[in-house]
């Protein structure tokens, strides 16, 4: 998940079958989801050099709970180094990856880096994992870009390596993609703290994996075509989010109550005229209506008071308690100033 992945052009609205009834609030989420304290994350990739520590402190002072960093082969902050720098510069801000491209590292290396950041930060780190999707980055680095099924298969095996290593347990994985055998504590020094695992994306198999093993299910609201040249708004409206949460729920079974639901808000617009701003966004997207934009849980429009009310209502409706917004990037202003004011209203 990254600022340049957001749906600003070449988008296709997903078609929903007329006879498909979205899950109701009562059956989709539980009181555990609707009663959790709201958490807020800021997602940044902008290189700031020696000013990064100052920036991390400003994020903490603004009331955010988490500073997350993406994992793309572009001129941006690298995820583990950035997370470590942010943790060292702050006192209670959590850091994390949103999300690591599993194909860029061996899972043993991912576990080693994760354990180190978690130990240094005193447990203020959450590990977000994904299957990778930007074909252009694979091509530029000379990496083979395989099918989505293969990439998710590889992520599943990777998780089966990473989790026991971080827990200080022996690992014995002999799969199609990884073969790792080690005694407890042999390859990775366990950090001695629980590291929340976030599995993020929009695809069904990814979210099923989140339901089975993750502490946090990260919901993006959209997907890409095979080479990531088009964004498909398949689950960008209320019915779509409910559908994706239902996938997590069905895979989770009895552990669903314990899973934190996270959503990545793609656009934050401070405005006194929500309808006009929705029309502007719809025109920028192309092929969707202002009503579709207003219905999207992944868009936040209005005054700061309206935004605060909307987030409270969305937690009631969807059970999402952890909301992430974007920092500045090329062509995009940071959502931090507006969301800082929203956070102040909610706390």
Question: Which stretches of residues belong to each language-model region?
Answer:
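Accessible peptide chain termini
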Residues: 1-2, 28
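Cationic, amphipathic, low-complexity segments that mediate targeting or membrane/lipid association
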Residues: 2-8
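Active-site-adjacent structural elements that line small-molecule/cofactor binding pockets in enzymes
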Residues: 12-14, 19-347
């Amino acid at each position: 998940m990254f600022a340049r992945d957001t749906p600003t052009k070449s988008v296709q609205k997903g078609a929903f079958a007329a006879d498909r009834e979205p899950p109701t609030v009562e059956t989709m989420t539980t009181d555990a989801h609707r009663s959790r304290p709201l958490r807020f994350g800021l997602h940044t990739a902008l290189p700031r050099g020696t000013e990064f520590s100052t920036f991390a402190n400003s994020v903490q002072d603004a009331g955010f709970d988490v500073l997350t960093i993406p994992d793309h082969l572009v001129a941006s902050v690298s995820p583990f180094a950035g997370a470590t720098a942010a943790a060292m510069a702050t006192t209670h801000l959590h850091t994390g990856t949103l999300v690591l491209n599993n194909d860029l590292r061996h899972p043993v290396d991912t576990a080693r880096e994760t354990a180190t950041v978690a130990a240094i930060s005193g447990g203020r780190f959450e590990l977000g994992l994904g299957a990778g999707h930007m074909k252009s980055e694979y091509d530029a680095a000379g990496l083979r870009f395989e099918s989505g099924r293969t990439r998710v298969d590889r992520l599943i095996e990777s998780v089966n390596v990473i989790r026991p290593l971080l827990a200080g347990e022996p690992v014995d994985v002999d799969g199609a993609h990884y073969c790792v055998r080690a005694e407890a504590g042999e390859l990775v020094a366990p950090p001695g703290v629980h590291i929340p695992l976030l599995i993020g994306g929009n695809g069904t198999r990814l979210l099923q994996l989140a339901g089975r093993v993750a502490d946090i299910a990260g919901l993006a609201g959209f997907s890409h075509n095979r080479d990531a040249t088009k964004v498909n708004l398949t689950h960008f409206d209320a019915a779509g989010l409910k559908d994706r949460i239902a996938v997590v729920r069905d895979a989770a079974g009895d552990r669903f109550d314990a899973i934190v639901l996270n959503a990545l808000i793609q656009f934050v617009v401070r405005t006194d005229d929500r309808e006009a701003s929705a029309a502007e966004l719809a025109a920028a997207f192309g092929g969707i209506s202002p009503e579709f934009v207003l219905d999207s849980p992944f868009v936040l429009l209005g005054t700061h008071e309206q935004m605060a009310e909307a987030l409270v209502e969305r937690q009631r409706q969807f059970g999402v308690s952890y909301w992430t917004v974007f920092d500045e990037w090329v062509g995009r202003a940071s959502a931090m100033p507006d969301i800082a004011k929203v956070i102040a209203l909610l706390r």
